[in-house]
Amino acid sequence: MSSSSYRDSYFQYRHLPAPHHILYAEWNQDILALPDEVANITMAMKDNTRTDAEEGRAPQDGERNSNVRESAQGKALMTSEQNSNRYWNSFHDEDDWNLFNGMELESNGVVTFAGQAFDHSLNGGTNSRNDGANEPRKETITGSIFDRRITQLAYARNNGWHELALPQSR
């Protein structure tokens, strides 16, 4: 047994006692493809398969993915259509930007949503207290990303910070 494997096992014993801790440690080292790249690859593969089926022949391995190439990173795939935003068109851009702009996700699954605080008064106006240079203070929501109550609270606060905009689950 080499000394490096002893150190690795000791580190895992002391610092990564649960299986999901090891998973989070591996996530920190992953390089993931952007959603646009994944969508473009899927579309390119469907187009190649459809063209081959129309011609009535089976595709050869070398020509099936001729318009899809691997990037230098090795994990992300690229296509000739680099500036497509089809993936993002299905989102409400302003709401999603407000929700995810201040979000921080740590490797242990703790998420922090930072948002602009609003006064919960009847008039629904912005925070009217004297906060220095009339800037609204920031509120944060912190908790486990796997706890649905945390994400629901962040979503509700994102949509006005004073009204619940989520549909009731039944």
Curated annotation (Swiss-Prot):
Residues 48-81, 122-141 are annotated as: Disordered. Pathway: Protein modification; protein ubiquitination. Pfam families: Apc13p. GO terms for biological process: anaphase-promoting complex assembly; anaphase-promoting complex-dependent catabolic process; ascospore wall assembly; cell division; protein ubiquitination; regulation of meiotic cell cycle; regulation of mitotic cell cycle; regulation of mitotic metaphase/anaphase transition. One of its GO terms (cellular component) is anaphase-promoting complex. Keywords: Cell cycle, Cell division, Meiosis, Mitosis, Ubl conjugation pathway. Residues 48-67, 132-141 have a biased composition (Basic and acidic residues). Belongs to the APC13 family. Component of the anaphase promoting complex/cyclosome (APC/C), a cell cycle-regulated E3 ubiquitin-protein ligase complex that controls progression through mitosis and the G1 phase of the cell cycle. The APC/C is thought to confer substrate specificity and, in the presence of ubiquitin-conjugating E2 enzymes, it catalyzes the formation of protein-ubiquitin conjugates that are subsequently degraded by the 26S proteasome. The APC/C is composed of at least 13 subunits that stay tightly associated throughout the cell cycle: APC1, APC2, APC4, APC5, APC9, APC11, CDC16, CDC23, CDC26, CDC27, DOC1, MND2 and SWM1. SWM1 interacts directly with CDC23 and APC5, and is required to tether APC9, CDC16, CDC26 and CDC27 to the complex. This is Anaphase-promoting complex subunit SWM1. It comes from Saccharomyces cerevisiae (strain ATCC 204508 / S288c) (Baker's yeast).
